[in-house]
Regions:
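N-terminal accessory regions of nucleic-acid-interacting proteins
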Residues: 1-79, 162
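Conserved DEDDh/DEDDy metal-dependent 3′-5′ exonuclease domain
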Residues: 52-64, 78-80, 89-210, 214, ...
Length: 234
């Protein structure tokens, strides 16, 4: 029998490896199919408990609007943002493909910015990422922000790696080597499918498939949600 810790909602935070069968989180996506070249909207259902409202776009003005809405809605609160990136898999030696998409998630609102196909990077995004009062969270996030800096000269000022955060909160140094899938299982008690056919797909395509958007949104949402759960533990 294992001992368990609880967050402020009473949900368990296991401090050792669970022996129960993991719950596979059901995930589905609704494609709104908007008749625009600039963007599309998706509703990603996660575990039948969350709907991740997702904007896919390469339009700088829509990125402006998304950021403005987030800042307006969270102006009186500490802002934490799940961050992830995707790029076309590198298939040639000594060739590194640039970041194709930047995913940002706050609560159930997610942006999938096709930065590779954007005519410009909006100043609002530059300021948002460089704001030291905003904490961007993810697994291996330091490598992600270094790639953003190398590929687009984007500086992310304040980051928190969920591996170290989970290791500290749960008192398990092994978690410093965990991936996002492992942390989702450990912290949220949910197994999240990450099919390789999507992981290694063409993220540089001008239009992503609904499955790619679902994958991208869930990754950023998981980062946000894992951090929220760990932060609520006392």
């Amino acid at each position: 029998m294992i001992s368990s810790r609880q967050d402020q909602t009473g949900a368990p935070l296991s401090s050792s490896t669970t022996t129960t069968t993991p719950v596979v989180a059901p995930i589905s996506v609704v494609d709104h199919g908007l008749p625009y070249d600039t963007h599309n909207l998706y509703d990603v259902s996660f575990n039948n408990t969350h709907t991740i409202y997702t904007l896919l776009t390469s339009d700088p003005s829509l990125v402006d609007s998304w950021i403005s809405t987030v800042l307006r809605d969270h102006q009186q609160r500490v802002l934490t943002v799940g961050l992830d990136i995707e790029w076309r898999p590198n298939t040639q030696r000594n060739m590194q493909n640039p970041v194709a998409t930047l995913q940002l998630c706050v609560a159930e609102r997610c942006l999938v910015f096709q930065i590779l196909h954007s005519p410009s990077i909006p100043p609002s995004l530059v300021s948002f990422l460089a704001d030291p009062n905003i904490t961007f969270v993810g697994v291996g996030i330091q490598e992600d922000v270094e790639k953003l800096l190398e590929d687009y000269n984007l500086n992310v000022a304040n980051v928190r790696d969920l591996r170290s955060f989970a290791a500290e909160r749960l008192g398990d140094l092994e978690l410093k080597r965990a991936g996002l899938k492992s942390l989702g299982l450990r912290v949220l008690g949910l197994e999240v499918a990450k099919p390789k056919r999507v992981t290694r797909s063409r993220w540089d395509n001008p239009w992503l498939t609904a499955q790619q958007v679902q994958y991208a949104a869930v990754d950023a949402f998981l980062s946000y949600e894992i951090d929220r759960r760990l932060s609520s533990y006392n």
